[in-house]
């Protein structure tokens, strides 16, 4: 628990509110060697970095495929868990029989980090990749007085329950692996990898990774502001962008977002169907008004508000409310496209940035100053 008190002073929000809202940006090493946040404006930098890495025989790492790919904040998240279980109690995936437990997810990553710490320290000292560190290297480092630490009794590179209970710096009950197995949150033949290994599959089973709805209930309930959702998205990004490993259903959604601008693949011309039957006209920017400067508000309808039957009722109600209140507004019509949030939550950060950049251009051209939204 030694990390608890400094951790609670490092809130992401300057207002010290819960870390809900936008996901953390995807950070990559730019062509100048500096960490660069991926945005629609830095996509060219990512292309240049990937070309430079390919020429040098390396690669640009996107997302967290190994424990060392997490930021210091991510690693601190894992070490600060108090094991209160509030996140698990409120998790909709856990409460509907899915294998995901936010608590066990964090503890598995924490225990893996504690187990592979000797390999990470040795790799840094010897200038090699953690996967290249051998038992002989560890023995030499230990003989030379290197601060390695060591789990005992590993079996085939996996940590036993007793090992996890002895892991340096891990403050847990000592039976996390037993809890993971009982919850079916870890495959019986795997456990928690005690050697450097890919996170997806070796530490976090695929079913666990893709069961998260990214609702944020775990973050909202956490007394120390651990950002479970961002850690899930970090691993998903690596799986989607580096491994192309994701549920088949997401492939269809990605294609529809890219080609049609909405998750269902419906035609853009149907975006105004929600307004049929209203006793007043809904002005469309570029058709009925030149730009948003001619009205009080731009009404951003969103994909669900335009296409989904239940959400259409909400859209109509908001439009009627604005009309009754005498507030002038206009919509973008078929110029509107998805915000890209579904792609971002699923780990496809590049598609998200493409859609976000497109929307920024659209809103800039529309001269939007004040926007009303109903989409979540």
Residue spans for each PLM region:
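Short, small-residue-biased leader/transition segments that mark boundaries at the very start
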Residues: 3-10, 49, 53
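Active-site loops and adjacent core secondary-structure elements that bind or stabilize anionic groups
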Residues: 9, 23-26
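Phosphate-binding active sites in nucleotide-utilizing proteins
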Residues: 13
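Juxtamembrane inter-helical linkers in multi-pass membrane proteins
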Residues: 17, 51, 55, 59, ...
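Non-transmembrane accessory domains of multi-pass membrane transporters/channels
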Residues: 30-33, 50-51, 57-100, 204, ...
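Vicinal oxygen chelate
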Residues: 35-54
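Iron-sulfur-cluster electron-transfer modules
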Residues: 69-72, 78, 100-104, 113-374
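Active-site proximal loops enriched in glycine and acidic residues that flank catalytic Cys/His/Asp
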Residues: 85, 93-95, 109, 226, ...
